[in-house]
Structures are given as C-alpha cells and as structure tokens.
UniProtKB/Swiss-Prot annotation:
Keywords: Lipid-binding
Organism: Streptococcus pyogenes serotype M1
Binding locations of hexadecanoate: 62, 94
Pfam families (alphabetical): DegV (PF02645)
Source taxon at top rank: Bacteria
Protein name stated in the entry: DegV domain-containing protein SPy_1936/M5005_Spy1650
InterPro entries cross-referenced by the UniProt entry: DegV (IPR003797), DegV_C (IPR043168), DegV_domain_contain (IPR050270)
Record flagged with keyword Metal-binding: no
NCBIfam families documented for this protein: DegV (TIGR00762)
Length: 286
C-alpha cells in the first residue's frame, strides 16, 4: 500500500524537490506589518524579503497550522483510502502537532479505519527536513508506512541541532528562549551556541566571544558524535559564513557530504539575520 509523506514548511525543504519526491508540504503563516503571508505555494513569502523587513524594524509573528487545514488534508486521504505519514514540527516549539492530533480524531469519527500516522519530530528547519528526507528514502526503497515511521522515530533521539544566532532578541520575543539567556547573548559580542535538547527545548550550551570562535565551537560540537556522514548546514543572510562552515565540516574524516539548506521564513522570523545552524545524526541519544 503506497502512502503519502507530509511535513510542514518549517522543514525548509526546497518545494521543487518536495514535489519531485511526492512530499506534501503544509504551511504555517506569518503576520508582519498587518499582512498575512503564506509559506507554501507560488505566493509564499521569501526569507530574504522577511529578513529585510526585520532589519528595518518589523517584528513578524508566526501562526501554527489550524485544525481545519489538517482536517481537510486528512479527510481527503481517508476518503480516497490512502495512508498518510505526517512528520510534525516540534510540539515544544509550536501547537501545530496538537492541531494535527485533533484533526485526526475528527476524521476518524467518520473514517475509523483511516491510516494517519503523526510523528512529533521534536525538530525544526534542517532537522525536520533531514528526517523527511530519510522517510522519503525509506519509502522509495520499499519500506511500508509503519516501517518508515519506525526508522524516523529511531533517529529522532540522535538528531543533533545546533544554532548560532547573531541576536537572541528575536528568540526571546517569540517566547522560544528565556529573557535571562537572551540577556547573556547581548553582552559585548558574546555568541551563545544553542542546541535542541532531549525534550525538544532550545537551550544554550556554550557562550563564546566572537563569531569566528563560535563557529569553530559549533564544528567541535558536531565532531563529538557523528553517525551519518551527511550533515546539513542552514543559514540566514550570511551565506559566506555558511560556506566556510561547510568547508570546515568537510575536512572531518567522518563527514562526506554537507547539504546547504537556507532557513525558511518561519524559522527566520524567530532567529533573525546572520544565523547559522547545523544538523547531524549522532551515534548516541541527546
């Protein structure tokens, strides 16, 4: 039985790639300066446009996917007797996962045998994208839905996500980081390195003076535990630093490929300009 893989716009996957690999994308929305912007489809807002507005003083807000949007997609699949695997944006960072659970319950009232599996990835951006790529590879190699789900869920505890943010104000403003942590990042070029812990929370793990030293520390953190030879590097604005980070990672003997994946508008709204991120699968749980 074939099945659909779906994920959010927060996975930051290239939309052409997603279409080519039969991945359904469902989008969060962004409110900025009184306008509502889509993050999926031909009229989606670009990260560059949003970041320019943020540099000019705009404070965008993001909205989770509502129950009705999920219900529409789930009901269509149930009506056509097609199974669906949805890889959800972290439940710690958004209410989107809960909306999906509620929508599934509604659909199963009419279609009790509907096959709708929902995974809380506890991830965002390239991490969520990484898991979706693994799911697509598993499905395309002949794995069924439950086998694919098991593969993804086995990787989630070992997925390591590192963020280097130029200004923690945006994370604090959006409620993704405490005011105390954000204050530390505002002191005299101190650059906190953050990661997503085992509970899915975004927390500081190191405080480094200067951006270049912080990038080297990010590489050092990645080198501590590598299981998969593919690494994803994401960025906002500063592609040059991202390329340098890629080169440093490729110098490691256990890394054979580094995929470059620009951060999408939803994540950009929360981290701001000049952010770098690395996503890697380790041997051990976080």
């Amino acid at each position: 039985m074939t099945f659909t893989i779906m994920t959010d716009s927060t996975a930051d996957l290239n939309q052409t790639w997603a279409e080519d690999h039969d991945i359904v994308l469902i989008g969060l929305t962004i409110l900025c300066d009184g306008e509502v912007y889509e993050t999926v489809g031909p009229n989606r807002i670009s990260s560059d446009y949003l970041l320019k507005k943020m540099k000019a003083g705009s404070h965008p807000q993001t909205s989770q996917i509502n129950v009705g949007e999920f219900e529409k997609v789930f009901r269509e699949h149930a009506r056509n007797n097609k199974a669906l695997l949805y890889l959800a944006f972290s439940s710690v960072l958004s209410g989107t996962y809960q909306s999906a659970l509620m929508a599934r319950d509604l659909v199963r009232e009419d279609y009790p045998d509907a096959v709708i599996e929902i995974v809380d990835t506890l991830a965002a951006a390239g991490g969520e994208g990484y898991l979706t790529i693994l799911a697509a590879e598993a499905r395309d190699s002949g794995k069924n839905l439950l086998e694919t789900k098991d593969i993804v869920e086995a990787v989630i505890p070992r997925l390591r996500t590192y963020f280097l943010v130029d200004d923690l104000f945006h994370l604090m403003r959006g409620g993704r980081l405490s005011k105390g942590s954000a204050f530390l990042g505002s002191l005299a070029s101190i650059k906190p390195l953050l990661w997503i812990d085992e509970e899915g929370k975004l927390v500081p793990i190191a405080k480094i003076r200067g951006r270049q030293k912080a990038i080297k520390e990010m590489v050092a953190q990645v080198e501590k535990d590598i299981a998969d030879s593919t690494v994803i590097v994401s960025y906002t604005s500063d592609q040059g630093s991202a390329e340098k980070l890629r080169e440093e990672l490729l110098a490691h003997e256990n890394i054979s490929d580094v995929l470059m994946m620009p951060l999408g508008p939803v994540i950009s709204a929360h981290v701001g300009p000049n952010t770098l991120a690395v996503f890697v699968i380790g041997q051990n749980s976080r």
